[in-house]
Structures are given as C-alpha cells and as structure tokens.
Amino acid sequence: MASLRRVKVLLVLNLIAVAGFVIFLAKCRPIAVRSGDAFHEIRPRAEVANLSAHSASPIQDAVLKRLSLLEDIVYRQLNGLSKSLGLIEGYGGRGKGGLPATLSPSEEEKAKGPHEKYGYNSYLSEKISLDRSIPDYRPTKCKELKYSKELPQISIIFIFVNEALSVILRSVHSAVNHTPTHLLKEIILVDDNSDEEELKAPLEEYVHKRYPGLVKVVRNQKREGLIRARIEGWKAATGQVTGFFDAHVEFTAGWAEPVLSRIQENRKRVILPSIDNIKQDNFEVQRYENSAHGYSWELWCMYISPPKDWWDAGDPSLPIRTPAMIGCSFVVNRKFFGEIGLLDPGMDVYGGENIELGIKVWLCGGSMEVLPCSRVAHIERKKKPYNSNIGFYTKRNALRVAEVWMDDYKSHVYIAWNLPLENPGIDIGDVSERKALRKSLKCKNFQWYLDHVYPEMRRYNNTIAYGELRNNKAKDVCLDQGPLENHTAILYPCHGWGPQLARYTKEGFLHLGALGTTTLLPDTRCLVDNSKSRLPQLLDCDKVKSSLYKRWNFIQNGAIMNKGTGRCLEVENRGLAGIDLILRSCTGQRWAIKNPIK
C-alpha cells in the first residue's frame, strides 16, 4: 500500500506542475491555428520523448520531458508488482506478436512438470510478457468500420480453478489493454475454489494494486463447476453487458466495439467472438478459419461451416449465424441473460450448457452469432481441471437438455449415448423448473430449431432399435465397426461405445457406428452383403447400388437375414483362433439388440 500511495502522490504533484507549465505556456505564447493546420494525434508513451527533439520551445520541451519522466516513474512502480511475482510486463520479449516462444534445454527440463500439471507450458508462460501483442486476424473490412462512442459498458468475467497465475494475469492485462476504458465497466475473477496459494493473496494483492477499483475477485467456498461459477460471476456484475471468458485467453485490438454494437442494436443477441488458437506448448497464436459452432447428438460441441447464405454474401466480415457455441467465450446483455434463465444451475461441472444456451436463445426469441470482426485467442489445454469423470457429467447434462428442450428428438441423445429411453441409470435431477421456464417464455418447438437454425443436423427418426448387438452363440462379444479403413464389420469384446452402436431402421437398414452430425460430414455406414464375400461389409449407404444388399430382415431374438441374398449374419467359432463374423446360409443363430423402441 505504501508504494501505491507514493505513486498517487507523484501523480498529483507532477500533474500540478504540468498544469502550471501549460497555463504559463498559454499566457506567454498564444498560438493562432491557421486554416489548414492539423492538430497532432496523441501518441503512445514511447513516442512522447521523441517529440521533444522537434519542439520549437524550451518550455514545451521541458513539459514533454516531464510528462515522459512521469510516465516512466509510474510504469516502473507498477511493473515492480509483476516482478515480485516473477512475471514480466511490457510489449517486447519472447512470444511478441504471437510468435512461438522457446526455452533453453535446461529450461525445458524444468518446464515438464508444470506443463503436465496445467495442460499448457506454464513455465514458458512466466517468461512471456503479460502485455505481449498478438496478430490481428480480423478481415480487412473490419478494421475500417466505425462504431458509436455511446456503446453499453461490459463486465468481463473470467472463471478459473487452479490455473497458472501468469496465464490468468495475461488474460486480465489483455482485456484492459484492448478494451476502451469508457466501455470497460469492470473485470470479475471467479475463483472456483482453487487450491494453489499463488491464486489467493498474491493474485488479489496484484490486481487490486495494478488496477485499483477495476477488478473484483469472487471466491466460491466449494468447487461448483464452470456452469455455476459463471452464474456467480453474473450475480456480481453491474455492467449492462456481460462477457464470459475462460481465464486463458488474449484479446485482439478492436474486439469489443463490434460486439457491443451488435448487442446495442438488439439486446436479445448473444455474440461469440471468433476464436483463434494459442498453442499450449509454445504460445504461438494461430488463426482459425471463420466458423459457426455446432454439436453432435451427444452434445459435444464442434466447429462447423458457416451457413450457405453467409458464403453467398461474399463478405467475411458479416456475422455468422450459429446454432450453439463452443463455450470458451460469449457476450450477452446482462438483463436478457437473466430473463432467459441464465445457464442451467442443475447441471454439474460443464458440458451441455453451451448447447442448452444456444437452443434456448433461438427458441425463446433471441439469436446467436459468431462475429469475425471480434477475435479472441484461446489456449486449448491438453488437460482440464475438471477432468475426473467429465464424460459422466457431460452425459448427465446432455440428458437434461434433451428432456427440457428437444421434444420428440430427445431420443437422438439417448441413442447417441447408447442409453435406454426409460430408466437410463442416470439421475438427471429435477427439470420441472426448466420446463416451466420454457413454458413461461412461450418458446418455439425443437422442430422449428432444426428446420430454421440447424438444418445441417442429421436426423434419425426412422430408428426402431439401437445399442449393442449380440449373438446367442457368443454373448461376450458385440458387433463392432472395426478399423475404419477395412470397411468390414467384426466381433469385439462388448464396451458399448460408438463403434458398437448398432441401429436398425424402418427401412431395414442396419447401421453401425456413432451417429453422424451434419450433412457435410460422413454418416454412419450400413452393413452390406455384396453376395460375393463371406465377410459383411460396412459401406456408405448412398453408394450401395443394390438396395436389397443393404436391407435386412430382423426381429428381436431372431436371425439377421439379408433381403438380397438370403444369407444370414452369423458367428463362426474357430477354437483357439477366435470367433469370426461371417455371412452364410442360415443355421438358426439369434441376435438381440439392447434397446428396442416401443
């Protein structure tokens, strides 16, 4: 606190001195501005000293030198805060401009442990400035656009749990450096009950001294998970707009104005900055192509191609309609976010909340878009802090989304996870409040969403049974798609994951493998009897010339017989050599599929 008081005293005294110089200068040397004269632009701190060499007046020269000295004193005082933490400020050094940073051989050895711990090279991060510059990957047109100065203020919310301190602080510095002062209401750091000591008093002392009055720290008393931690951040926010970000991002210049402008035009828009990648091993910033954000029927998020109308417009600066969001960053009007029920607090940890928000926003009167004119770089960690059993939480959360929002299409989520529609064995909690929310908001149905927002999503309404498929002569093995390049179905010890997801349809097709996602990506393949081979083929259904060769007669606990050849899918026991899946004349073997749909 003493050092901060000294800085404040220095500021006041020097400002008084500078004001005196300016008044004296104005009285003694009045300057008439002639027609056509241009005012000088305000220059960065580093350029101020250079101006004194061209000054026409010794008094002006003294003023400029004193201003430069004042800035240097303040900068050195503040920079001392980061040095006490072993960190670096300033715009140069390793990784400048988003280039890959490197370590010496001896440093690389020291970096291995922290790298494994955090899922990124935290040791290297400490050698990179908190203020480093990164590339501006915005489309050229974006840099020419002008925005109103009367935009709403934003509260930037970072969520962290056991992150490296340098990475958190670089996120904060980047937000401050690249968000106009009059638009940045506050920064809120939500600590989801971290264990690391450096994230307690050292973090709090640094941000309060470095950015007094700007940064709030909210601490959860127990580990809540990303979803509920974001809700806590929203509760603490006072800005008209709230931006939610992972605490391992860096912002590009000009990121905020286009986002806030779009929300000012329509408060029901949820805006996603375009995402670039920060490589977790060397912190190089890589440009990602403009994309929309979609998902699979398991509700795993993914990048998808922008819709056709965006491509047809031929303008890469235009907003991109998106069905959902990846989840590492989104910006929304604070009140509107509350009106639509925030994120689902009944979900655990994370996974699915990003899909739920996209569906809910579209069905309940809003929209969601990716903005190429706003770019944020994000570290994709190879290890995540909530890793323990994250698959279970994602599955549970996905079922909550399905039950509340997907109407008849909820079956697709159960199929994708290979779970029975009734009694799936997972307690998803009470969803009555979320269903009541949907009703009170008078939201559209999920069919409308698929038709108008996510028409690329594949649909599987023709499914009449799904799950593991077992033969009565070999009950410990299941039908499996085997290596993709072999195009041949096999038998494999049962595990119930995607390669063993069999799906029998009304048309008599027998599909094998995880559900497809969008129509632009390959679909699940069909089991085929080509009449020549003893081995059942797995082929693209649309490329099989004879419809009969891909159609099968099958009833539960009965034979699986091809309609074109009359041969049956059976198993052949070869003793020590194992069990083969073959096609041959029917011998009465029976098959059972796990989940018939009633």
From Swiss-Prot:
Catalytic activity, reaction form: L-seryl-[protein] + UDP-N-acetyl-alpha-D-galactosamine = a 3-O-[N-acetyl-alpha-D-galactosaminyl]-L-seryl-[protein] + UDP + H(+); L-threonyl-[protein] + UDP-N-acetyl-alpha-D-galactosamine = a 3-O-[N-acetyl-alpha-D-galactosaminyl]-L-threonyl-[protein] + UDP + H(+)
Record GO biological process: protein glycosylation
Record domain Ricin B-type lectin: where: 465-594
Residue ranges, annotated region (Catalytic subdomain A): 151-262
Subcellular location: Golgi apparatus membrane
Protein name, entry field: Polypeptide N-acetylgalactosaminyltransferase 17
Keywords: Disulfide bond, Glycoprotein, Glycosyltransferase, Golgi apparatus, Lectin, Manganese, Membrane, Metal-binding, Signal-anchor, Transferase, Transmembrane, Transmembrane helix
Residues the record lists as binding Mn(2+): 246, 248, 378
UniProt-annotated glycosylation sites, renumbered to this chain: 50, 461, 486
Region (Catalytic subdomain B): 319-381
GO MF terms held by the record: carbohydrate binding; metal ion binding; polypeptide N-acetylgalactosaminyltransferase activity
Metal-binding among keywords: yes
Pathway: Protein modification; protein glycosylation
Function, as annotated: May catalyze the initial reaction in O-linked oligosaccharide biosynthesis, the transfer of an N-acetyl-D-galactosamine residue to a serine or threonine residue on the protein receptor.
Side of membrane Cytoplasmic, spans: 1-6
Domain of life of the native organism: Eukaryota
Membrane topology qualifier: Single-pass type II membrane protein
Family note: Belongs to the glycosyltransferase 2 family. GalNAc-T subfamily.
Signal peptide boundaries: none
Cofactor: Mn(2+)
Sequence ranges on the Lumenal membrane side: 28-598
Residue numbers binding substrate: 192, 223, 381, 386
Transcription regulation is among the record's keywords: no
Predominant location category: Golgi
Domain notes: There are two conserved domains in the glycosyltransferase region: the N-terminal domain (domain A, also called GT1 motif), which is probably involved in manganese coordination and substrate binding and the C-terminal domain (domain B, also called Gal/GalNAc-T motif), which is probably involved in catalytic reaction and UDP-Gal binding.
